[in-house]
Regions:
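Glycine-rich phosphate/cofactor-binding loops in nucleotide/flavin-utilizing enzymes
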Residues: 191-248
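Glycine-rich beta->alpha junctions and the first turn(s) of the following alpha-helix
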Residues: 38-133
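A short core secondary-structure module
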Residues: 1-31
């Protein structure tokens, strides 16, 4: 199948400057290798892409001159997907419990749908989904304000403008609670549904697998450190981050 669309790539010039470029995936010399074999979310722009003398447009430019809120934008995309997974977990859990016929002698009601402990689990899952959505929406609204600011001020660079850097900081603040809430929701739902919820035809495991895969794409372990470093030492988030060599 012929690829379509575009891919954002980075390349290093002869002077050591890292440049950003958007490549047409139908251009000559592009080879896409479908080698992403993660156990969850498939459409995460993962996998290998090779380029051989591939032509690009003339707007090649250093990464620090890209739109300043770019990293925040990509992260919000992942967070929105996570929030959607959490919501699906809540809806699926409620639907499954409403249809569950069997209960246990140690239960609290004649039917699972009336068992107060199981209803509590459903409520907790729904609360986790709500939290993931609300936090993501708050960060997205901040990012929208920043985008309008960038447009009005002719694309300020991230490392030159604290307003743009603070948008990245707010997204960093959102990452861990959204991930935690989503992973908790996609795990806890099984507590309300019993062993039958693990039936392969229900595929409820996909929710956790997708969430876990998304959460691993941009290491969240660093996000809290970045926030703490700003609060204690006043250091803004890094201008750009990617897979590469860590600075000492």
């Amino acid at each position: 199948v012929a690829p379509s669309g575009w891919s954002r790539e980075a390349t290093t010039g002869e002077d050591g400057t890292v440049y950003s470029v958007v490549v047409d995936l139908t251009a000559p010399g592009v080879q896409i290798i479908d080698d992403w074999n993660g156990f969850g979310q498939r459409l995460t722009a993962s996998g290998t892409c090779l380029f051989g003398n591939t032509p690009v447009e003339d707007d090649l430019r250093p990464t620090h001159q890209r739109f300043g809120y770019g990293q925040s934008f990509y992260q919000i995309y992942h967070l929105s997907t996570l929030a959607g997974i959490a919501r699906r977990a809540a809806l699926s859990a409620a639907q499954e419990l409403s249809q569950r016929a069997r209960t246990f002698t140690t239960g609290n009601a004649d039917t699972a749908a009336q068992d107060v402990q199981l209803l509590q689990v459903i409520g907790e899952v729904a609360s986790q989904a709500y939290a993931a959505h609300a936090i993501t929406q708050q960060a997205a609204q901040r990012l929208e304000h920043t985008a309008q600011y960038v447009i009005a001020h002719d694309q300020p660079r991230h490392d030159d403008d604290p307003q743009v850097a603070l948008a990245e900081l707010e997204v960093c603040l959102a990452v861990n609670p959204v991930v935690d809430a989503t992973l908790a929701a996609t795990t806890a739902l099984f507590d309300a549904l019993g062993a039958s919820a693990t039936a392969s035809n229900k595929a409820l495991d996909r929710l956790w697998r997708n969430a876990r895969t998304l959460a691993n794409h941009n290491p969240r372990v660093y996000k809290s450190r970045i926030v703490g470093n700003y609060l204690v030492n006043g250091e803004l988030p890094p201008a750009q981050w990617r897979v590469g060599v860590a600075k000492a």
